[in-house]
């Protein structure tokens, strides 16, 4: 959910077909019907879509119901070795860690690990306005 929402109506405002195509190529269990249906639904462009203002946070913290892993972030620590030494408090959004924490973890954001590509809150606000405006045009 978070990936498709981030790519489309949540933050990047990209066509849902780009994400669908990547999933078609990369998923081991890719299936045309559910892949298309899910991308349409989560992009908010299908008649059966969820309300456009429901935007998933791509960076859930350890307390979020959308966080499917333990507080320890073992999945991130295993698969993203650059972040393995970050304190749990910052591992979901390492760019928020103070400089001294990044240095102690051996990973400076913007040098050793990419900086965020968008301001998540601002892009969400702008995209919600765009979506609301586009719905007004077809009503």
Model-derived features: where do they sit?
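C-terminal catalytic domain of photolyase/cryptochrome flavoproteins
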Residues: 1-139
């Amino acid at each position: 959910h978070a990936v498709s929402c981030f790519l489309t109506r949540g933050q990047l405002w990209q066509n849902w077909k780009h994400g669908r195509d990547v999933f078609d190529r990369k998923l081991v269990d890719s299936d045309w019907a559910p892949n298309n249906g899910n991308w349409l639904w989560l992009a908010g462009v299908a008649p059966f879509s969820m309300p456009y203002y429901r935007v998933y946070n791509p960076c859930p913290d350890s307390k979020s119901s959308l966080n499917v892993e333990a507080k320890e972030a073992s999945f991130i620590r295993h698969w993203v070795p650059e972040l393995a030494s970050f304190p749990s408090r910052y591992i979901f959004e390492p760019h928020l860690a103070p400089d001294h924490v990044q240095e102690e973890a051996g990973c400076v954001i913007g040098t050793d690990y990419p900086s965020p590509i968008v301001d998540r809150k601002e892009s969400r606000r702008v995209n919600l306005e765009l979506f609301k405006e586009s719905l007004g045009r077809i009503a």
